[in-house]
Amino acid sequence: MKSARIRIRKAESADVGRMRELIECSVRELQAADYTPAQMEAALEKVVGVDSQLIADGTYFVAEVRTSSAHPEAGQPSGRKDSGVGWVLAGCGGWSKRKTLFGGDHWSGRENALVDPKHDAAKIRAFFVHPAWARRGIGSKILEACEIAASTAGFTSFELGATLTGAKLFKERGYVEAEKIEVAVKSGISLPVIRMVKRP
């Protein structure tokens, strides 16, 4: 596959349908080495998904890629009038000024109260990359955009709840493990998650 142009922009409500498809594909394919099928399906049903609060806050980003040749299997068409032929949705991720550490709209453990950038860490949230674009720098570019935006908002430290799969990326970018968490999803099924932090 030839090299691709990558651009990062803020997610919009019109992106939600494509983001959901991307997230489901990302979880089922990229996390298969770290979680059982039952864990992945339970996560999609109860925890993982689009967080519309991030979109409303203007803190959710999507990565679009455009290659020099057509790759219809790679990601979902962006659907934007200014996107042009060949742009596809390849990843998403955001940051938050709220207490929620992880989880989509349907997760019962959400806490939408605001945090104080003088004392609290910004939350790095909801990172997913389409399998066709894995290990091509998509996640790193989204993370960079999130850290810059959160820093501009006054935050100096960052915190996240990483999947076993995603923890590899964050470790490479300076995040360290703070604790291991077992998230009870449904009867008999839990998800191991790693809380990670990055400080100045």
Q: Model-predicted segments: where are they?
A:
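C-terminal "cap" of GNAT-fold acetyltransferases
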Residues: 156, 163-167, 173, 179-200
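Intrinsic disorder/low-complexity segments
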Residues: 68-83
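Conserved acyl-donor/pantetheine-binding loop and adjacent beta-alpha core of acyl/acetyltransferases
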Residues: 57, 79-134, 149, 182-192
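Conserved GNAT-fold acetyl-CoA-binding loop/helix
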Residues: 24-50
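Conserved acetyl-CoA pyrophosphate-binding loop and the N-cap/start of the following alpha-helix
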Residues: 133, 137-145
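Hydrophobic beta-strand residues of extracellular immunoglobulin-like
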Residues: 59-63
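Conserved GNAT acetyl-CoA-binding A-motif
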Residues: 143, 150-163
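A short beta-loop-alpha structural element at the N-terminal edge
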Residues: 6-21
